[in-house]
Amino acid sequence: MRRLYNFLSNSEKRNLRNRKKLNSGVKRLRISIFKSNRHFYAQLINDEKGVTLTSVSTLDAKIKDVCKRGINTETIKQVSSLMIERLSNMKLEQKLVFDRGAYKYTGLVSQFAEALRSSGFKF
């Protein structure tokens, strides 16, 4: 493992560290995110059943008009508010796990997470 670890890029190393922490035996629902240059995706996953419970992205009909040229703070606000709306309809009572993947916890990723936290969801 040590030899393999030396040949990985920084984002791949970060992703491995995060996966190791997420798979530490905690049975919680996971919010996974993915971002590209133009779009932002988030989904709530039940890892025990292997099912996506809900998802939201900048390609949704409600948000698509706001996201014309790429992702920015306004689109993240729209995506997070839509995710909060969908999660509150599900009436979750347990803590969630925030899976940021290989992304650093800065910028749009932290803004999305803080919006969820401010609405009462716990990671």
Curated annotation (Swiss-Prot):
Task: Name the chain's protein.
Answer: Large ribosomal subunit protein uL18
Any single GO CC term annotated in Swiss-Prot or TrEMBL for this entry? cytosolic large ribosomal subunit
What does the sequence similarity comment in the record state about its family? Belongs to the universal ribosomal protein uL18 family.
Give the source's domain of life in one word.
Bacteria
Q: Which UniProt keywords apply?
A: Ribonucleoprotein, Ribosomal protein, RNA-binding, rRNA-binding
Q: Which NCBIfam families match?
A: L18_bact (TIGR00060)
Pfam families per record: Ribosomal_L18p
Keyword check for Nucleotidyltransferase, yes or no: no
The protein's matches in Gene3D superfamilies, at most eight in alphabetical order, are given as: 3.30.420.100
Query: Which InterPro entries does the entry mention?
Result: Ribosomal_uL18_bac-type (IPR004389), Ribosomal_uL18_bac/euk (IPR005484)
Functionally, this protein is described as follows: This is one of the proteins that bind and probably mediate the attachment of the 5S RNA into the large ribosomal subunit, where it forms part of the central protuberance.
Q: List, in alphabetical order, the GO biological process terms annotated in this UniProt record.
A: translation
For this UniProt entry, the molecular function terms from Gene Ontology, in alphabetical order, are: 5S rRNA binding; structural constituent of ribosome
Instruction: Spell out the subunit comment.
Output: Part of the 50S ribosomal subunit; part of the 5S rRNA/L5/L18/L25 subcomplex. Contacts the 5S and 23S rRNAs.
